[in-house]
Swiss-Prot record:
Tissue: Predominantly expressed in lung, spleen, thymus and testis and, at lower levels, in brain, bone marrow, peripheral leukocytes, skin and trachea.
Gly residues: compositionally biased ranges: 39-50
Gene that this sequence comes from: GLCCI1
Biased composition (Low complexity): 1-13, 26-38, 86-105, 162-177, 236-245, 357-369, 521-530
Pfam families: FAM117
Lineage: Eukaryota, Metazoa, Chordata, Craniata, Vertebrata
Positions of region (Disordered): 1-55, 72-285, 319-417, 505-530
GO CC annotation: cytoplasm
Protein name per its UniProtKB record: Glucocorticoid-induced transcript 1 protein
């Protein structure tokens, strides 16, 4: 007995776990439970397993809570700092609590080091019995009360049990980093969530529904392995990738058919319909010029069928279009000879210009003043055609630069891959810029000579003429040799001067003051005006009218 108690005390001193001390305090607070536990352990003989038949009441089972450090110590038996025999002795010593002296029977005089493995086996047998007993203890009313110290100790011990169980399940760093560095993620065979390893950002909602169905089926049947699931998922992903590749190929083929996006596609479609059908509301010749020619058709993505249609119409339009007469003007204005000539070259349009001028000279002039001579094929003409033919007649081979789209007209004709009408527009712009100073006075309002001449002359003419006239009337009235003529002239000049002064009073005072100073400085002009006024009345009236 003394040896067992000393060994238990020494082993308990070796265990640094505070839950055993906490359990002793809680057990000391309930002495009848401790006595009952001691009697139960004594009745159990050499194993201390007699707690199982003493499970009649909840109070008698309280000391079994000391088995939690035993589980912790079992998890740490393989630690290098503690030998397995000492760990087993420590676990046995910390198990019964205050009734440890009564635990071993007096008929076993074995030393503690030898008795520890013998007692460990029946305790291992009694371990599965603790789980139903713990359920019974959790159903007891004393455990449910939150204020009791027993409940607090149980909470701490249950947390320790959870942490110890999770510590057992985790694998070492070598098992994790080894396959991870080789490119293989470690898989847990017991958990059925490898389907969740997909990223939902790359999946569609239909795939999410399939994943949910897979999860449910895998949870019900545990015979499914993770390898089968991964194979199915890989097959599904391959199918999805093939579908996406096919759709992307279709879209790329569509884009190859029309590499120039935007309005070029619509222009080509409208040209096709306009060339095939007679009622076409287009009346602008600048829209279909670009893509009618043979070589740029391949550049702009028009199919060879449309190209054949254009070529057939170019060949047979001169025969068909002459008997046709369309009064509504709904036909697309596409002259056949111009289209056939524009298909011959990419870089320059000089042959088309020559052919167009020759064809315009060969055609008979139209009756209507708004139609050019080329409108015999039944197509209505636009103002651009009219201006184009006027420029042809005047000797310039260019329409107006209304549609010149290049920002640098001097350099854009160097690009050989541009559409042919771009080259024509560049030429038009250069020639119009060179001819602009000749025809500028017809269109522009102010001239540089006139602008410089206005402040010195025309705007201030009446003010300068009124300056010498104001003192001239006084001189005429004072120094008049003939009274009759002077009175008539005086009445005429005073009336005219009063009307003139009333007109100039609305102007600036500075101008009148300047005119007065000018009249004082120029007396010779006053004498000349006196002679003119005395000479002839109508001459003075004409002078005022001219001013």
């Amino acid at each position: 007995m003394s040896t067992a108690s000393s060994s238990s005390s020494s082993s308990s001193s070796q265990t640094p776990h505070p839950p055993s001390q906490r359990m002793r305090r809680s057990a000391a607070g309930s002495p009848p439970a401790v006595a009952a536990a001691g009697s139960g352990n004594g009745a159990g003989g050499g194993g201390g397993v007699g707690c199982a038949p003493a499970a009649g009441a909840g109070r008698l089972l309280q000391p079994i809570r000391a088995t939690v450090p035993y589980q912790l110590l079992r998890g740490s038996q393989h630690s290098p700092t503690r030998p397995p025999v000492a760990a087993a002795a420590a676990s046995l010593g910390s198990l019964p609590g205050p009734g440890a002296a009564r635990g071993p029977s007096p008929s076993s005089p074995t030393p503690p080091a030898a008795a520890a493995p013998a007692e460990q086996a029946p305790r291992a047998k009694g371990r599965p019995r603790r789980s139903p007993e713990s359920h019974r203890r959790s159903s007891s009313p004393e455990r449910r009360s939150p204020g009791s110290p027993v409940c607090r100790a149980d909470k701490a011990k249950s947390q320790q049990v959870r942490t110890s169980s999770t510590i057992r399940r985790t694998s070492s760093l070598d098992t994790i980093t080894g396959p991870y560095l080789t490119g293989q993620w470690p898989r847990d065979p017991h958990v059925h969530y490898p389907s969740c390893m997909k990223d939902k950002a790359t999946q569609t909602p239909s795939c999410w529904a399939e994943e949910g169905a897979e999860k449910r089926s895998h949870q019900r049947s545990a015979s499914w392995g993770s390898a089968d699931q991964l194979k199915e998922q890989i097959a599904k992903l391959r199918q999805q990738l093939q579908r996406s590749k096919q759709s992307s190929r279709h879209s790329k083929e569509k884009d190859r058919q029309s590499p120039l996006h935007g309005n070029h596609i619509t222009i080509s479609h409208t040209q096709a319909t306009g060339s095939r059908s007679v009622p076409m509301p287009l009346s602008n010749i600048s829209v279909p010029k670009s893509s009618v020619s043979r070589v740029p058709c391949n550049v702009e993505g028009i199919s060879p069928e449309l190209e054949k249609v254009f070529i057939k119409e170019n060949n047979g339009k001169e025969e068909v279009s002459k008997p046709l007469d369309i009064p509504d003007g709904r036909r697309a204005p596409l002259p056949a000879h111009y289209r056939s000539s524009s298909t011959r070259s990419i870089d320059t349009q000089t042959p088309s210009v020559q052919e167009r001028s020759s064809s315009c000279s060969s055609h008979s002039p139209c009756v209507s003043p708004f139609c050019p001579p080329e409108s015999q094929d039944g197509s209505p003409c636009s103002t651009e055609d009219l201006l184009y033919d006027r420029d042809k007649d005047s000797g310039s081979s260019s329409p107006l630069p209304k549609y010149a789209s290049s920002p640098k007209p001097n350099n854009s004709y160097m690009f050989k891959r541009e559409p042919p009408e771009g080259c024509e527009r560049v030429k038009v712009f250069e020639e119009m810029a060179s001819r602009q100073p000749i025809s500028a006075p017809l269109f522009s309002c102010p001239d540089k000579n006139k602008v410089n001449f206005i402040p010195t002359g025309s705007a201030f003419c009446p003010v300068k003429l009124l300056g010498p006239l104001l003192p001239a009337s006084d001189l005429m009235l004072k120094n008049s040799p003939n009274s009759g003529q002077s009175s008539a002239l005086a009445t005429l000049t005073v009336e005219q001067l009063s009307s003139r002064v009333s007109f100039t009073s609305l102007s600036d005072d500075t101008s009148t003051a300047g005119s007065m100073e000018a009249s004082v400085q120029q007396p010779s002009q006053q004498q000349q005006l006196l002679q003119e006024l005395q000479g002839e009345d109508h001459i003075s009236a004409q002078n005022y009218v001219i001013i």
